[in-house]
Amino acid sequence: VTPKGCPMTDLLKTSLNRRTVLQAATVGATGVSPALRALVHAQGSDAPEKKEVKIGFIPLTDCASVVMASVMGFDKKHGVTIIPTKEASWAGVRDKLVNGELDFAHVLYGLVYGVHLGLAGPKKDMAVLMTLNHNGQAITLSKKLADKGAVNGAGLARLMAAEKREYTFAQTFPTGTHAMWLYYWLAANGIDPMKDAKVITVPPPQMVANMRVGNMDGFCVGEPWNHRAIMDGIGFTATTTQDIWKDHPEKVLGTTSEFVQKYPNTARAVTAAILEASRWIDESLANKTRMAETIAGKAYVNTGVDAINQRILGRYQDGLGKTWDDPNHMKFYNDGAVNFPYLSDGMWFLTQHKRWGLLKSDPDYLAVAKAVNRI
């Protein structure tokens, strides 16, 4: 199964025409999916049951819609107060979602499915309420490899074959998106990530520091940490994830199925607020700049504004002298195309979990996606 030209993806996505997707994705009279609306109507009121919610996030550029929903007051407009809660690792986000310390999270798409199926950790029924962003991740390799001629995947494969030493690559969570992008890219270049390399898990904000001290040869992570590695002169961008799969799904708004059942109106209100923030971010250059200035602060990503702002505007450099304007940079709304939680997206992550041995047998792909993605 491949991201590009996947028949399953094409079939399911083309079954929803543009008008249907925009109706589902745009804040309006209903604001959220039919599944959530049905729960709301059963309750007889649309007032949020829980007025204050904690939403966990990892310091990454794509936490922006959660943060800006709070900062810009979109949450209050929908009758809730969002408290963005900075977390240290994806494992911590998982654990706090499962035990109820967090109500929602900005979270890796594949992580939600891993928890739902109990892969390498606790099992709990989960829910994806919306997709938070497309694109905007990358694979960074150490500058030391470029000095030896490994400036892309093919060059890396040749160098690994010649040196015959153990190579170490990092991703951010075993069932997460970054692991899947890394594995897919390595395999596409003839490198078996399960046999030909050592793969470790490192939280996103620690990637650059770990590469600086030589703990890994490369990593896959979200921005701004790939650009930060270039700014610090220790790494270069071997590929962006949008070059692997244009407009791929990335982070989602995740919660437990139990929370949605207990607080359907709150789930509706939070989804609507973050959707409105997503639209606001993508509306203008000025909004993106303000967003970058906000999330660069210590309470959120804690990095320089330039580390965020360049790639959020599509201004890329690879750290080896190449610069380009990428029209497929990180998007939060993109005229409503980003946010619908396609069943086919969830199913694709399941196929990759099976491909890399995280799932030992084939699940009912469609049934699992229907259980998790609230459409």
What are these regions (language model features)?
Residues I139-T140, V252-T255, F259-V260:
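Short glycine- and hydrophobic/aromatic-rich loop-to-beta-strand nucleating segment
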Residues V1-L16, T20:
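N-terminal secretory signal peptides
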Residues K13-T14, T20-A42:
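N-terminal export signals
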Residues D247-H248, R290:
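Short gly/pro-enriched beta-turn/loop segments at secondary-structure junctions
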Residues Q43-T201, N210-I230, I234-D247:
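Short, glycine-/small- and polar/acidic-enriched structural segments
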Residues K262-R374:
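Secondary-structure end/capping motifs
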Residues E101, H106-Y109, H116-L119, K143, ...:
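Sec/Tat-exported extracytoplasmic proteins
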